[in-house]
Amino acid sequence: MAPQPPKRLLRLLHDALAETPPGRCVWVALSGGLDSSLLLMLAAEASQDSGQVLRALHVNHGLQAAAADFETHCQQLCQRLGVPLTVERVAIESLGEGGVGAARRARYAAFAQHVKPGDALWLGQHQDDQAETLL
């Protein structure tokens, strides 16, 4: 039997889903890493009886050799969970900041394009991640 997430965590996610206005969407920014993949899995479970619309958004910057693998992982995970996935492939033009700043701007532009007023955007971050959580 697979381990079950703590009921308290699922309640918190269910409550957060309930705060999104009816008819609006909860988007999970899905990088394909552990944090966002786990967030999507938990959100999918929490949303099963909520009636809330859940979607995932993957931004493929193409900056890593494994970028295609991350995109494939996102597609397979979303298919398995029954969560619609939007993939944005972006071209990073300026690598003057090591690509990080340009990639962040491209990611934010993708968020702005898809996440509409009243929608929610969830980011999977861990304790040591930068303050992008304050988006």
Regions from the language model: what does each represent?
Residues M1-L135:
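Core alpha/beta nucleotide-donor-binding catalytic domains of modification enzymes
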